[in-house]
Design a protein with these regions (language model features):
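Short, small/polar residue-rich loop motifs at catalytic or cofactor-binding pockets
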Residues: 235, 339-342, 403-405
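Noncatalytic scaffold domains of N-terminal-nucleophile
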Residues: 1-28, 33-198, 203-205, 210-248, ...
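Extended C-terminal regions of large enzymes
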Residues: 250-255, 410-427, 439
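Active-site rim segments in enzyme catalytic domains, especially the processed small/beta chain
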Residues: 46-70, 222-225, 353-418, 442, ...
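A short acidic/small-residue loop/turn micro-motif
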Residues: 77, 362-364, 425
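Extended C-terminal subregions enriched in glycine
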Residues: 281, 304, 351, 399, ...
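Short beta-strand scaffold segments in enzyme catalytic cores
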Residues: 52-64, 343-348, 407-409, 499-507, ...
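Internal maturation/activation junctions in enzymes
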Residues: 271-361, 373-374, 381
């Protein structure tokens, strides 16, 4: 894939083509980019169920045609029963099971908050039932099982088989579904119908919330009805980076948006435009190590921050980090944060309203726990907490966990506006940097910037080692050079899903919309 799709009225990019089409249908009916994104978010929760769902969290970056962007933090806090005492005797929080399902799922609150913003911006609204219609239909009538879903189910089967509700929900006759088969989710269809009829807020304050809380109590999850009722999506100020090419935005803590902006801020002080592949990878990897150090030292629940994250993006903060990079040698490297099953999606409508959105349940199938009679698999984002009371990420009721999720946007000096992002744990900020560097600084066409071979320092979806992973399509000379520089290189497949599913939309000054999707996904850039 080398050519982008270009349209005149609207564009939607998602890692599953059915979600792209759901968004496009809303745009064709006159809906806003925000409404289209809610439709896509609901659809992809059904058609890519191993990656995301109603039981996860979400983050939004909404860029109006003029003025400042609006961020939404729709992540949930630890439940009121999630105390250190509740995990006494354990070294770390389990990654699977009811004790891993310890944070409120916030993504539906983000849909609701985003629709309020849409009404404020446009003065009109499509019914929620219309926005959820495709998702309900796919859950009820069945989805085509992707190779990604089939592989995730089979590879994690022994780990997840005995988690409450998992086998009944995700297996067919006791086995992982086959790629290309039809897979139905009737309980989830019923839940979506309740949201369509009772409103999205019913997930937290209504009959659905009561059903969720009853299931949580029965399974021994540390979340209560009171925790659901107390949850609200928030609108934090986004982080900003003043780059030579324009203004870049990302999400504030508890996300690692700081990392994504710091990498680009550091490399903005290096010569990236003329760098060859080995130099590009080396410099971004070295910037990544320094940005990860900032992350690990500072990022936590925003109420517990010891610094102003925005101050870490000033020229005075970034220049010393850039100066410390040695073009002839790789610096030492510790370890990453681990995997993240996530979907990034983008939508831009005819008015120029642009949305960068990300939704996740953390690991594949999250905690593995499916709440009774709902079809909702609950996230395990709380596994990011520490059981060390002195740790920056120490578990406490009501505390937000660290998030790898971070949707990005940029308003460039030449008039272009870009929304972009990726799934993939530690890989998200690195993929953002690769895409931005190739497209904006090196003049590589948008689709080719995503399709070209990528790299990953650390761990991500399906990976456990902390090496520098390169796709096999990198030239042998590039791989050899990176090893000479001291990088511990591991070569993966030519197109590896470990590199995440990236996407981007660019609105050009003439109003044309250019969309690009990832050949590593099942996605599409759908426009009209």
């Amino acid at each position: 894939m080398h050519s982008s799709n270009v349209s005149t009225h609207g564009m939607a990019v998602a890692p599953h083509h059915l979600a792209s089409q759901s968004a496009l249908a809303i745009l064709r009916e006159g809906g806003s980019a925000i409404e289209a994104m809610v439709a896509a978010a609901a659809a992809i929760a059904v058609v890519y169920p191993h990656m995301n769902g109603l039981g996860g969290d979400g983050f939004w970056l909404i860029v109006p045609p003029e003025g400042d962007p609006i961020a939404i933090d729709a992540s949930g806090a630890a439940g009121s029963l999630a105390t250190l005492e509740a995990y006494a005797g354990q070294q770390h929080i389990p990654h699977r099971g009811p004790q891993a399902a310890l944070t409120v799922a916030g993504t539906v609150s983000g849909w609701d908050e985003a629709l309020r913003i849409s009404r404020d911006l446009t003065g009109r609204a499509l019914p929620v039932a219309r926005l959820l219609a495709d998702a309900i239909g796919y859950a009820e009538d069945g989805i085509p099982v992707t190779a990604s879903q089939a592989h995730a189910t089979a590879s994690k089967l022994e780990e997840l088989r005995h988690q409450p509700g998992f086998s009944e929900t995700w297996l067919v006759s006791g086995e992982a579904p086959r790629p290309g088969s039809r897979f139905r989710q009737p309980a989830l269809a019923g839940t979506l119908r309740m949201l369509a009829s009772d409103g999205l807020d019913s997930f937290y304050r209504g009959p659905l919330a009561e059903r969720l809380a009853q299931g949580m109590a029965a399974l021994g999850m540390p979340i209560t009805l009171g925790d659901l009722q107390a949850h609200r999506a928030r609108r934090p100020a986004p982080l900003t980076l003043q780059h030579q090419q324009g203004t870049l935005w990302n999400l504030a803590p508890p996300t690692q948006g700081l990392v994504s902006l710091a990498i680009l801020g550091i490399t903005d002080r290096l010569n990236m435009a003329d760098a060859d592949d080995a130099q590009t990878v080396h410099r971004i990897v070295e910037a990544t190590k320094r940005a990860f150090a900032l992350r690990d030292a500072h990022i936590t629940d925003p109420r517990h921050l010891d610094v102003d994250a925005q101050q870490l993006l000033t020229p005075e903060a970034l220049q010393p980090l850039a100066d410390s990079i040695d073009d002839a040698s790789a610096s030492p490297w510790g370890r990453g944060k681990g995997p993240g099953d996530t979907v990034w999606m983008g939508v831009v409508d005819n008015s120029g309203l642009a949305v960068s959105f990300i939704q996740s349940i953390y690991h594949e199938f999250g905690s593995g726990v499916v709440l009774p009679d709902t079809g909702i698999v609950w996230q395990n984002r709380g596994a990011a907490f520490s059981l060390d009371p002195q740790h920056l990420l120490a578990l406490a009721p009501g505390k937000q966990p660290f998030h790898t999720l971070n949707p990005a946007a940029a308003r460039l000096n030449d008039g272009r506006v870009m929304v972009y992002g990726s799934m993939g744990g530690d890989g998200q900020p690195q993929t953002q940097a690769a895409l931005f560097t190739r497209y904006i600084l090196q003049g590589v066409p948008l689709q080719e910037s995503i399709s070209r071979p990528r790299w990953l320092l650390g761990r991500t979806w399906g990976q456990s080692s902390d090496s520098l992973k390169l796709e096999g399509r990198f030239a042998p000379a590039c791989i050899a050079r990176l090893r000479e520089l001291g990088h511990e290189v591991e070569v993966l497949a030519d197109f590896s899903e470990a590199m995440g599913h990236a996407g981007a939309i660019v609105r050009h000054p003439n109003g044309l919309l250019e969309g690009a999707t990832d050949p590593r996904s099942n996605g599409a850039a759908a426009g009209y």
